[in-house]
Amino acid sequence: MTAIEIKYELYRNTARNGDIILWKSNSLASDLIRYFDNFYINADDEKIKSPSYYTHISYVHWHRNRLENCDAWYEGITNVPMSHRIKHYVDFCVIRPTKINLVEHGINEGLNEWEAQVKYDYFRLLRIAIVKKTGIDITGLSNSKKYICSLFIQKYCENIGLKSYEFCKLMTPQDFIRFANRSIYKEEVEILLNDN
């Protein structure tokens, strides 16, 4: 068994509906994301150096006895067993919402997007890369009816009532760690299995 498979087996025993999963990969696409996502702007508009470790994000839900992973993948919104998704990654961590009263609503909204076959927004990736490196936002470069993984999960967080992430226009997966439990929204989430 690989390290991620062992970690998955440990996590699966404690996984909860609505957990958010951050993924690390060593692919070329992930290397490019890390190149562009090496800082963030804090609430005081200060540029903070913060190298990116995680480059993909999803949420999980139980369907019968299977832990499924819902995310915006290169083919659009997908819903696959988490055991399939780990084959593409080398590490992951969990962001667990502490308030669960709206989790089922958020899960169902995401599954509705999957059933509607919402496509992936490749141009939004380019838009974020340009903003991260130049500070220039080309707003017409993305499609509001398509998703990338971080926008899909930001919408999920909105649907379950999390406030920590609503201020950021163009989030990356790593931003979900950077902005978890901002001081004004203490204890909205807990971070688990983060070996980074």
Q: Across the structure, where does each feature detected by a protein language model lie?
A:
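A structural motif
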Residues: N101-T134
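Solvent-exposed, acidic/flexible segments
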Residues: P51, I100-E104, K146, S150
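Activation targets extended, charge/polar-rich intrinsically disordered C-terminal tails
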Residues: V131-N196
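Short, structured beta-strand/loop micro-motifs enriched in basic residues and often containing a Trp
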Residues: M1-I6
